[in-house]
Amino acid sequence: MPQSDHTQPLPPLDPTLDVTQNHYWTYHNLEALLSCKRPLTASQDEDLFIAVHQICELAFHQMILDMERVLTALGEAIADNTDPIIGDTSEACYFFPRILRLYEVVLTTMPILKTMRAFAEFRTTIGPTSGFQSFQFRHLEIMSGVRNYWQGGTKDTQGNPHIAETEFDRRYGSDIAQWFERYHNHNLAYYYDTLLQRSPGNTTAEQISALLNHPHASPVLQNMRTYDNLQIRFHQFHLALAVQQLKLVGVEVGTGGTSFRNYLAKYHKQQAPLFPGLTQFDDREQGTGNKE
């Protein structure tokens, strides 16, 4: 449980650090950070394209850190024998809302790409780079409990995967396999299923209703519900953005040559929702209908 009222200053990880010389530009490594944006053309839109994706990658990085904390806290709460369903979840619910806010950052940042007018100026120059290759997003999805739906997502009409996918597999295939093994029984979807199994009731709706009235389970499910909606919105927006951008350049494949229609649509067809019954239950209870 967070003890914000009793925290004490921590010493620097580097005991030789002279904190009097730790200025804003050095602490945030601004020069190194800004040097990471390196457009390949003189297009006035390419620097924006890079910046938006780098902002999202920074958000993903922090989301991964906080998701690890959420999963650890949930695992400990599940193992707490003081409650037959789940113990104190305040630690998990301290970090979970931060993940949700960061996901909102991603969802409000990506639409800026719609302001580009000259995607065609640099699209071919950036080569096989593709959002498909975001290993951090894959890491986050695996921690969420998503299966390997993206496998083969770039295959052409002959069934051959694009270089964007083959190179991604070569570079990060072993990491992906390790993440699937590590989070097999340690992910959001797994803990959701565990809570359902422990909850009284003969139907999923009855089980969810009981959990939403449980003092420790309820805030977790509310965070999960929001996370699921954000995940679905991200995939829906990504698909819509890809369609819009490719209309500008008059082609049918995404950056890197990926078959975006099949790949981006697979999540909704094969994975969503992450927490079956949760969003629908909320809609039914509130009488709002599913608006996602």
Where is each model-derived feature located?
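Short, C-terminally biased terminal segments at protein or domain edges
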Residues: 283-292
